[in-house]
Amino acid sequence: ILYNKDTDVVILPEMWNNGYALEQLEEKADFDLERSTDFIKNLALQYQVDIIAGSVSNKHHDHIFNTAFAIDKTGKVINQYDKMHLVPMLDEPAFLTAGKNVPETFKLSNGVKVTQMICYDLRFPELLRYPARSGATIAFYVAQWPSARLNHWQVLLKARAIENNMYVIGCNGCGYDGKTQYAGHSVAINPNGEIIQELSTTEKELTVTIDIDAVEQQRKAIPVFDSLVPHLYK
């Protein structure tokens, strides 16, 4: 996919720098994203493409975060986000520190407004409302989602697309890590909740063409943001 001159943006999955080895994060985590950003910057510059760089274990001020970041084709870091929702079933809070800031809307080199979140964040629909209402047209979810809950992955991604009338891209790991099998099934979903393309359980690249105008059309047809009454939801 990196060799396709027409590619605007490349997406990587969650925790690609060391896998999901929570017990080893103290020794394997990056420091202030130094190694990870250098590596991704070189790729972005070499191939002249924006990169939604998945997430990495990242040590900052004696705390380890699960940090997603994005770099544009000039090598500039254009977004950084620390995973807010840590998975209690996997004891993530014992190894990681939760982020305190909601995901931001940021622009790709082509001017498209996007946002990014990490794995378990997908279960919290409130989180996407903020960037969606500020103009984000694509939400990238990077993950290591297990096969045991593949149905949840597929349904929730569709739900986020439909709720916010936007494109949702899910980039998930695959294969095994110890006894855990990851679901794969990276997927692109349009603002109507329809699958554009989807992978299976094996490692492969997925190339998708997106019509950004479809977001505006869908938001005009079903103006959910105009109908929100947040003061009544408290």
UniProtKB/Swiss-Prot annotation:
Residues 1-212 form the CN hydrolase domain. InterPro entries: C-N_Hydrolase, C-N_Hydrolase_sf, UPF0012_CS. Gene3D superfamilies: Carbon-nitrogen hydrolase. PROSITE patterns: CN_HYDROLASE (PS50263), UPF0012 (PS01227). The active site is at E14, K83, C119. It holds the Pfam family CN_hydrolase. Belongs to the carbon-nitrogen hydrolase superfamily. NIT1/NIT2 family. This is Hydrolase in agr operon.
